[in-house]
Amino acid sequence: MHKLFEHQLEAVEIAKQSSNQRICLYYRTGSGKTLTSLLCMQAWNQDDVLVLAPPSTHNHWKKTAETLGITVDTISHAKFRMSHYKLSKTKALIVDEMHLLGGYKAAGWMKLNLLSRHLSAPIVLASATPNYNDADRVYCIEKILHPAKSKGYLSFLYENCKLEMNPFSQTPDVTGFLEYPDAAAYLADMRNVAYLPDNVEYEIDEVSYSFELEPAFHNYGLLSRTNRLAASQIEKEHARIIYSTIDRAGYLHKPLSDLVEQHINGPTLIFCNHSSIAEAAQRSLATKGYTTVLVTGKTTAAVKQRNLDAFRDGDVKALIGTASLATGTDGLDKVCDTLIILDDTQDDSLRRQLIGRILPRGEDSDASQKQIHRFNILS
């Protein structure tokens, strides 16, 4: 028997009252979207469901569904987008990590939109709150939930948004919403949306680390390890991060490695935006006697699951990874109180998802015991 939070019970009630059996779970990261989605399907008397979700979460979906007597078939977002993949018009559908289908011009969302017009079965859309931060994303949700209300994207903009004409585009620039402070508030107030605000309070400890690069790098963009000039500012910035963190042998520079070790406290999650830095961190910690597992975009679903299980079971000290850690990693909050953002991302939504991996669950979660260290690489 599952112990349910109030927001999960409210979502089920919204599902029951939905005239078209469609709902969006607009929850913060780590709020039990998997179980809640399936509970909505159970409320609609659905026992055979297609789940569109990241491959690393497929086993979790199936195990959770079993406890409710529901059979699920799982597919990835990539497979869903394939033109030859056909979908049933009579089978209930759960779309997890909805934002991974892209915006209104993306092939994934357009396929879902076309299916939803003819689907005679319930739909649950689910994704974490940080990912709904613009008009495009909100339109994509509204079009699926209320196809009769929402027309085209331009009509949506003119009816709901503050706009500025763009001389270089047929689509005007959105500067705000007419009746709401932002896109998030618009979605939270939408009919058939179950909303749980992202109001967990936590502190981020900023850790500064300095490394002196050669003057030729700053002056000319000389990449000394490949003996050529950086082709762009983007390449130069990537090189700056890599050169400042990784030595020529493929390990973290010793001062940085020592600084990372100082912030390890019990089972620790370590995020790196670059896979090369994640690999270097694993090598460096191994020399210090730490047991670790690595999860990157190259890690297969089976290996990722095995590594996550090893970390959850306490077999290893640190879980190191890239953006792959943002999805399919439920349950880390129960075993891990420390997150080290060694190599930060520019994506605020992704960072919030990663932080959410170690935050406790529930409506009024106390995150005072959680430690989040964000490294600032200066060079």
What label would you give each PLM region?
Residues 1-24:
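Conserved pre-motif I regulatory segment
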Residues 286, 290-323:
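Conserved helicase ATPase core of P-loop NTP-dependent helicases/translocases
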Residues 92, 109-199:
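Conserved P-loop NTPase motor "coupling/switch" region that bridges the ATPase
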Residues 347-365:
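Conserved SF2 helicase motif VI
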Residues 202-290:
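Conserved helicase/translocase motor-coupling segment
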Residues 20-39:
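Walker A/P-loop
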Residues 359-379:
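Conserved segment of the helicase C-terminal RecA-like domain
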